[in-house]
Curated annotation (Swiss-Prot):
SUPFAM superfamilies: ArfGap/RecO-like zinc finger, Nucleic acid-binding proteins. The keyword Transcription regulation does not apply. Residues 250-273 are annotated as: Disordered. Belongs to the RecO family. It holds the Pfam family RecO_C. Residues 257-273 have a biased composition (Basic and acidic residues). The gene is recO. This is DNA repair protein RecO.
Length: 273
């Protein structure tokens, strides 16, 4: 395959050499592609638009030994709303980063392409953070890391309670009885029953129905943090843009009146704080 066409999204774009950009593309047919767009940083470059983050375009690529080369590009969608709102932009950046870290070049994932493409549109009509969390849970589920949110990941009993331990190592929530059993207590983060219920809806529900869901500031912060923790621990990679976005979420107060930050700590299964 010397020259080939690919309809792809730009999920990462960075400077390369004096006037080039190194693009990470994600296509339905070929999965992730690393390609050099030569000369696109020059003001008069005709391919400049096709090297912008989140651009969806038809690319004519030349196959190389380690990096492909962009020969031609025909932009189709630029998602302009992502550049007019900080929350939308941060959510889109977080989703693109997760997709990049969770996939390898040359492995097609048509379902993930559809999920990503749809989610970039959806942030305009839904709470961007809600779309971001849904995206993370569905992506991890597709890759085979479906978190257990209904039954205890250790014993299989249906979980109940106002606060439960979410443990990526165990594969989901862990009931109170299993938290301290064995020589190695479960490690994770506490999640409220309300947030856990919403996470179930995000994982199982359809993207088109997301705008029907509502959450408060406490649930938003909690689910964003738990989703990031789940992805990072499972993939063993750091999500930098998620950390930046989470810091922008205003912290409210939980129903008990305690400060949220005092309640958001890792635990070792021996106690709640």
């Amino acid at each position: 395959m010397g020259v080939y066409h690919a309809d792809a999204l730009v999920i990462r774009s960075r400077e390369y050499g004096e006037s080039d950009r190194l693009l990470t593309l994600f296509s339905r047919e070929y999965g992730k592609i690393q390609a050099v767009a030569k000369g696109v940083r020059k003001p008069k470059s005709r391919q400049r638009a096709g090297a912008q983050l989140f651009t969806y375009a038809e690319y004519l690529l030349h196959k190389g030994k380690s990096l492909d080369t962009v020969n031609q590009v025909s932009p189709r969608e630029s998602f302009p709303h992502l550049w007019t709102d900080l929350d939308m932009s941060m959510a889109a950046t977080a989703m693109a980063e997760l997709l990049d870290l969770a996939t390898l070049p040359g492995q097609p994932h048509p379902e993930l392409f559809t999920l990503t493409f749809s989610s970039l549109f959806l942030v305009e009509s839904c709470d961007p953070a809600l779309v971001q969390c849904t995206y993370a849970l569905k992506l991890m589920n597709y890759l085979g890391y479906r978190p257990r949110l209904v039954e205890c990941a250790e014993c299989g009993q249906r979980v109940q309670g106002e606060r439960l331990l979410f443990s990526p190592d165990a594969g989901g929530v862990v009931c109170r009885q299993c938290q301290t059993q064995g020589s190695s207590p479960a490690v994770g983060r506490w999640v409220s029953g309300g947030s856990l219920g919403l996470m179930r809806q995000l994982l199982q529900g359809e993207l088109e129905k997301l705008n029907r869901l509502r959450w408060n500031q406490w649930s938003k912060k909690e689910i964003l943090e738990v989703s990031q923790y789940f992805c990072e621990q499972t993939l063993d990679k750091s999500l930098r843009s998620w950390s930046m976005g989470n810091r922008l979420v205003n912290v409210g107060q939980n129903p008990s009146g305690k400060d949220d930050l005092n309640e958001r700590r890792d635990v070792d299964g021996t106690g709640e704080s």
